[in-house]
Amino acid sequence: MTLQLNGEMLTINDIKTFLNKEDTVEVTQEALERVKKSRQTVEHIIENKETIYGITTGFGLFSDVRIDKDEYNQLQVNLIRSHACGVGKPFSEEVALVMMVLRLNTLLKGHSGTTVALVEQLVYYINNRIVPVIPQQGSLGASGDLAPLSHLALALIGEGNVFFKGEEVDSRYVLNQLNRNPIQLQAKEGLALINGTQAMTAQGVINYIEAEALGYQAEWIAALTHQALNGITDAYNEKVHKARNFQEQIDVAARMLDWLDGSELTTTQGDIRVQDAYTLRCIPQIHGASFQVFNYVKEKLEFEMNAANDNPLIFDEGDETLVISGGNFHGQPIAFALDFLKLGVSELANVSERRLERLVNPQLNNGLPAFLSPQPGLQSGAMIMQYAAASLVSENKTLAHPASVDSIPSSANQEDHVSMGTIASRHGYHIIENARRVLAIETIIALQAVEYKDIDKLSPKTYEKYQELRHIVPSITEDRQFHKDIEAVSQYLQDLAYM
């Protein structure tokens, strides 16, 4: 399939499908016409020797330095080379690929003044999966993600490394193999490639996809735990949740009842106890709040995916054309959103760890063996899995500290406030990985716990999950290296996010 790009209507679901099916991209004719018209403005500026930031001047503190006309193109190449100061491990291939798609989509709005040739080069790289190797660290999140996007731009001009067919290789080598020339950057184009928030937004899109999936997965995992503990279903009654009327809470309660429908292990209030602990009783309230966060983040990401965040921006007003220096590259809206996402995911892990603690604690688990050990004393069972979960949620509490409240001035105080949004995105993904492992641990323990209660009494939907997962992780009949089980179930959960 082909993903049509026009700068206006790209969605997270489009990106998810694009990644899952290895689609190609195609630019609409209408968008190309906007690009051409925008470029005409840049050519007019050059012809008339106007003073416009980043086209005929230097950058940052050097914005008052006028550049000679015969050096306009070299200025753009120098910009890319000097700004490619990223360090550390690279972004995943998926994030870097999404970064290219998002930057292309921004250019198609027709406010950036690039050539059609640059657009075509981006399309070629995306469709042939020539993916720039982009270090994760080094961005302040304003003026956009300068360092990461400079590494992206390097690949387009045949410098730097790329991922290609499963290997990291020199970009010039790949271009030679494909008989493709590197792009020759024209005036304004280097700046148009790197002034934006595509690194934080691309990682943010991946974060959202996997976080939302974790939210849904946490429900059937919690449903297994609920049955192992003979939980009370009255708390999920629709009347309770409509009385508060948060839609996400109502939806989680309905889905929990759906997962539990037909179970012979659940109870009603008064059967065994009058009410459950909060980690069971308040699943709709807790998980629902995380979905509120996810919905907020999705809205902000999709705004930014279709936004013009270059500088300066070109506006064709019919009778006149305006070139305006602004600050749409500032990542604060996305930085806030991605910090918020960290909280929503962290709480899914926090409540999961408390649920799995109830499963292994003989004082709380309604008659199950201590730590679900097949031979208590001789075999430790799930004891240290709870330790691991506790460690992961504690680590998340430090990672959840908001990056967006920090700022360090740069460029001799010309760029005196920055967003740190890319740090928020990176820390957010670490939180998601940790949370996924916590939920994997709850899954393993809940699967074992329901075996003590009789798996034939599970609800039909959770019984299907039980059978599916037993092909991945066997029953605990004796102590073994549980880290392998945790990683296997975690990978299973991650794979589900893209199905």
From Swiss-Prot:
Top-level taxonomic group: Bacteria
Per UniProt, location of the 5-imidazolinone (Ala-Gly) cross-link in this chain: A142-G144
Assigned EC number: 4.3.1.3
Subcellular location per the Swiss-Prot or TrEMBL entry: Cytoplasm
UniProt enzyme class: lyase
GO CC aspect terms: cytoplasm
Enzymatic reactions: L-histidine = trans-urocanate + NH4(+)
Membrane-spanning parts: none
Chief localisation class: cytoplasm
Disulfide cysteine pairs (residue numbers): none
Any Pfam family the entry gives: Lyase_aromatic
Record keywords: Cytoplasm, Histidine metabolism, Lyase
Alphabetical list of PROSITE patterns matching this protein: PAL_HISTIDASE (PS00488)
Post-translational modification, as annotated: Contains an active site 4-methylidene-imidazol-5-one (MIO), which is formed autocatalytically by cyclization and dehydration of residues Ala-Ser-Gly.
InterPro entries found in the cross-reference section: Aromatic_Lyase, Fumarase/histidase_N, HutH, L-Aspartase-like, Phe/His_NH3-lyase_AS
GO terms assigned for molecular function: histidine ammonia-lyase activity
Keyword Ubl conjugation among UniProt keywords: no
UniProt cross-references to SUPFAM superfamilies, sorted A to Z: L-aspartase-like
GO terms of biological process kind: L-histidine catabolic process to glutamate and formamide; L-histidine catabolic process to glutamate and formate
PANTHER family: HISTIDINE AMMONIA-LYASE (PTHR10362)
Family per similarity comment: Belongs to the PAL/histidase family.
Protein name: Histidine ammonia-lyase
Species: Staphylococcus saprophyticus subsp. saprophyticus (strain ATCC 15305 / DSM 20229 / NCIMB 8711 / NCTC 7292 / S-41)
Taxonomic path: Bacteria, Bacillati, Bacillota, Bacilli, Bacillales
